């Protein structure tokens, strides 16, 4: 059997959905299968390009809900990530749990001199055309706080 001996590289950067925020908790019934409705607890983070995509890392940062100032104490939570086959995510068989990122409790203020440490999941994953990645939170962030999920990758 002949193998592909020529490495392939992504053609176009794909940084996922801009301003992907999760701030409230998913319902217990949806928290393990990725079937939540898209909203403040569950958000689309990435869509693969027409020829598929490669993802290098997923980062979770402390942020604020749109139009708000980041100030207060974040609750500790887990951000769960699901790979969806491009079909309706509210059908459990269309989703696969991709990974989890633990985010510790953190007090933030907008003009603080303290650096908030992002949580990074190095993943190196090739995904088929049209597949999506969704992110959801297991615990509400609190107040006007939210976690921003960003994905670094590219389209083939």
Predicted regions and their residues:
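C-terminal interaction-tip segments
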Residues: 1-38, 47-50, 88, 126-156
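Extended extracellular/luminal ectodomain segments enriched in beta-structured repeat modules
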Residues: 49-57
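Short beta-strand/loop motifs in extracellular/secreted proteins, especially
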Residues: 56, 77-79, 143-147
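Buried hydrophobic-core signal for structured, non-transmembrane domains
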Residues: 58-61, 133-135
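Short amphipathic, basic-aromatic surface patches that mediate peripheral association
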Residues: 60-70
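Beta-strand elements of well-folded, non-transmembrane domains
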Residues: 62-64, 85, 153-155
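Short, surface-exposed beta-strand/strand-loop-strand elements in extracellular ectodomains
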Residues: 68-90
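Aromatic- and Gly/Pro-enriched, solvent-exposed loop/edge beta-strand patches characteristic
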Residues: 91-150
């Amino acid at each position: 059997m002949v193998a592909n001996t020529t490495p392939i590289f992504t053609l176009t950067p794909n940084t996922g959905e801009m301003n992907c925020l999760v701030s409230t908790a998913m319902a217990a019934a949806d928290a393990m299968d990725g079937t939540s409705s898209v909203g403040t607890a569950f958000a689309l983070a990435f869509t693969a390009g027409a020829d598929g995509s490669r993802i290098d890392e997923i980062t979770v940062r402390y942020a604020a809900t749109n139009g708000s100032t980041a100030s207060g104490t974040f609750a500790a939570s887990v951000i769960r990530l699901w790979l969806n086959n491009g079909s309706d995510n509210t059908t459990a068989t269309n989703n696969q749990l991709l990974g989890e990122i633990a985010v510790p409790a953190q007090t933030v203020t907008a003009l603080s001199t303290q650096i908030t440490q992002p949580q990074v999941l190095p993943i190196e994953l090739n995904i088929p055309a049209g597949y999506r990645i969704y992110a959801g939170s297991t615990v509400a962030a609190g107040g006007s706080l939210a976690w921003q999920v960003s994905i670094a990758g590219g389209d083939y």
